[in-house]
From Swiss-Prot:
Keywords: Cytoplasm, Phosphoprotein
Covalent S-S links between cysteines: none
A Pfam entry, by short name: BAR_2
GO cellular component: cytoplasm
Annotated organism of origin: Saccharomyces cerevisiae (strain ATCC 204508 / S288c) (Baker's yeast)
Region (Disordered): 174-210, 290-372
Name this protein carries in UniProt: Uncharacterized protein YPR148C
Length: 435
């Protein structure tokens, strides 16, 4: 057991704990120092106070809130509604990016096509005529059709190949039959069977014409929907590149810019309201101090007047008749001294004048730093609101949405016109055939 704990040292553990504690303390001190530096910044303090005011406004404890212009409020609602509309349209038009959106995968058809494409490679060395026909028909042999038109075109090609194989087999059998007849030994048998051979040739020609007409029907049908499928693929590509891309740009860039500007307006309003509240609080505090100083000066003035009145009455009561003559002789001298010496009333008046001068000497509220910052925040609030209004007016203009919908309808019109032209051409071919 001693071998397992040979490297154990209590001093190492103590040193490690002490080192970790020192690092943690240093990190904490640095964080506090950075926090103190940031808290000394006026903008940082204002940001913290504005966040506090935001919470107070959310809770409904603050009622003095700056109101935004009615035009701004209406544009906000219109912008939000238009953004919802664009997102709703994009949710549907994203379907054009999904291949085969108008023809859901059919498991039975897919397995059948996959089997027909691979069975020749598994069980035989020769490829069928149908596969050769499909390759020569410039037809896309995808595992899953990308559209309903392509599915019909593919089915028509398969039908055409089926009848072509049938026609090919019939011709091969007729050829063998004719060769067997030509190798007949007797001329009499050949002469007797001549009329029967002519009748069989006429019937075969009628059957060949019927098969060829069926082949033409499915070939025309396949070509019609092959062209329709190509037109649809082009329309889908234009929808994705033009319509969807413009909608995504409108949502992800233009409306995002509007949200950023509205956020700036809200932040500047919060800062302005916070600073306005601070300035009002300081004004109220200063007015309270002025009223308190005026009240103290007035009370001191009243007390000083009471003291002077009491002293004069005491002087009038103390002198006797015996001392009237010497006092009358020195009355002039005392009156001169009293005229030169300041009275209690004079001292109180001078103190009040000094206090009023000190109050008047203080810088006015309008010229203080807080009011300068308040004016700056007000200008910032107004400029941000103006910029947001201009941007929202530009984005919410109906011409933008009108242009997008016209673009959508033009793509649809081109595709549907092509569909009509292809179907009319196919019907013209079908009407010209007699089966």
């Amino acid at each position: 057991m001693s071998g397992y704990f040979s490297g154990f040292s209590l001093n190492k553990i103590t040193d490690s704990i002490a080192t970790a504690a020192h690092k943690t303390q240093d990190t904490l001190n640095n964080a506090l120092a950075n926090a103190n530096v940031n808290l000394n910044d006026p903008q940082t303090r204002l940001s913290i106070k504005s966040r506090t005011r935001f919470v107070q406004e959310s809770l409904g404890t603050v009622s003095d809130i700056s109101k935004l212009p009615p035009q701004y409020q209406f544009l906000e609602k219109k912008s939000d509604s238009l953004e919802k509309v664009c997102k709703r349209i994009l949710l549907v038009s994203k379907t054009f990016e999904v291949e085969g959106y108008d023809y859901p995968p059919n498991l039975t058809e897919s397995i059948s096509d996959w089997w027909s494409l691979n069975k020749d490679g598994w069980f035989g060395s020769k490829k069928s005529e149908s596969s050769t026909k499909k390759k020569g028909s410039n037809h896309d042999d995808a595992f899953l059709p990308r559209s309903f038109a392509q599915a019909i075109s593919k089915a028509a090609v398969d039908c055409e190949c089926e009848f072509q194989n049938l026609e090919h087999n019939e011709k091969a059998e007729l050829k063998k039959k004719k060769e067997s007849i030509k190798t007949a030994q007797t001329t009499e048998a050949q002469g007797a069977d001549h009329n029967e051979e002519d009748e069989e040739d006429e019937e075969d020609e009628e059957d060949d014409e019927d098969l060829s007409n069926l082949i033409k029907v499915f070939d025309s049908w396949s070509t019609c929907y092959k062209n329709i499928d190509e037109g649809k693929a082009e329309m889908d590509s234009m929808m994705v590149k033009e319509f969807n891309k413009k909608l995504e740009t409108l949502i992800n860039q233009d409306f995002k810019k509007v949200h950023d500007l509205r956020k700036k307006v809200e932040e500047s309003r919060l800062k302005f309201d916070t600073m306005r509240y601070e300035v009002k609080a300081k004004e109220a505090e200063l007015e309270a101090k002025k009223a308190e100083a005026t009240g103290e000066a007035h009370s001191k003035d009243v007390s000083a007047k009471d003291i002077s009145a009491n002293t004069t009455t005491s002087f009038d009561e103390t002198p006797s008749t015996e001392d009237e003559k010497p006092k009358s002789e020195g009355a002039e001298e005392e009156s001169k001294k009293e005229a030169n010496e300041p009275t209690v009333d004079d001292v109180a008046d001078r103190k009040e004048d000094l206090k009023s001068n000190k109050v008047n000497d203080e810088p006015p509220i309008e010229e203080s730093e807080d009011n300068k910052l308040l004016e700056k925040l007000e200008d910032e609030f107004v400029s941000n609101t103006t910029a947001a209004v201009e941007t929202m007016e530009e984005i919410t203009d109906s011409s933008e949405i009108l242009g997008l919908i016209k673009l959508f309808q033009n793509f649809q019109l081109v595709y549907f016109r092509q569909c009509v032209q292809e179907v009319e051409a196919n019907l013209k071919v079908l009407n010209g055939l007699e089966i």
